[in-house]
């Protein structure tokens, strides 16, 4: 009887430990996707969806919004993965999930790639190819061009890289309005240029 009680206690302890590890991992993943940035992506994309002419169902709109946020999360994770060495040397960033060791670099890279790939492919099926291609371009622009090139070569990196932050509402517009692409592109181009005038 006593042995059985010990076994039950051991199993309960193992379950509690596993649950705590899962919760901690999700907390670290939440930090990894840069929630402040993602909330802005969701907000601007939602505004675009509300303004765009469309007869799509709320379900399709909701899925498209989630996929855009997932793509943005994937690129944010890839950004953190690439900057992990630099982050480990700065007081402001050394406690981020990867440099602190709370999430391994390989795990972060895998999640970032999965989020990015899945969001692009799924947006193609749930929305259209134009939105999918533009989402792929945005992910590559931010996680490769901005993160790996601009940040380390020019003080104007935010100005040029800011295009990645301006594209989610364009993707949202296109994802539910189909071919009506030129108006949002002109609008975002004008807004981006005016915002960074010197």
PLM-predicted stretches and their roles:
Residues 72-99, 194:
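Acidic (Asp/Glu-rich) catalytic motifs at the cytosolic membrane interface
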Residues 191-198:
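Conserved small/polar residues in nucleotide/adenosyl-binding loops
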Residues 92-133:
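Multi-pass membrane catalytic core of lipid/isoprenoid biosynthesis enzymes
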Residues 43-44, 51-82, 133, 140, ...:
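Membrane-embedded alpha-helical segments that form the functional core of polytopic membrane enzymes
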Residues 44, 160-174:
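Small-residue-rich segments of transmembrane alpha-helices in multi-pass membrane proteins
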Residues 34-48:
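The first (N-terminal) embedded transmembrane alpha-helix
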Residues 25-37, 97-108, 145-164:
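Interhelical loop and helix-boundary elements at the membrane-water interface
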Residues 1-26:
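Transit-peptide-like, low-complexity N-terminal presequences
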């Amino acid at each position: 009887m006593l042995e059985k009680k010990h076994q039950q206690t051991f199993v309960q302890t193992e379950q509690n430990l596993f649950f705590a590890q899962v919760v901690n991992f999700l907390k670290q993943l939440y930090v990894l996707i840069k929630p402040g940035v993602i909330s802005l992506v969701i907000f601007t994309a939602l505004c675009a969806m509300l303004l765009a002419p469309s007869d799509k169902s709320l379900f399709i709109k909701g899925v498209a919004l989630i996929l855009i946020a997932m793509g943005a999360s994937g690129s944010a994770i890839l950004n953190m993965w690439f900057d992990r060495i630099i982050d480990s040397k700065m007081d402001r960033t050394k406690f981020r999930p990867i440099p602190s060791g709370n999430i391994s670099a390989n795990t972060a890279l895998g999640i970032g790639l999965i989020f990015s790939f899945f969001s692009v492919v799924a947006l193609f099926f749930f929305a259209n190819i134009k939105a999918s291609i533009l989402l792929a371009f945005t992910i590559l622009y931010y996680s490769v061009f901005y993160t790996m090139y601009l940040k380390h070569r020019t003080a104007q990196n935010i100005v040029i890289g800011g295009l990645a932050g301006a594209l989610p509402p364009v993707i949202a517009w296109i994802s539910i309005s189909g071919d009506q692409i030129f108006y949002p592109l002109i609008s975002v181009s004008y807004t981006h240029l005016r915002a960074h005038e010197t």
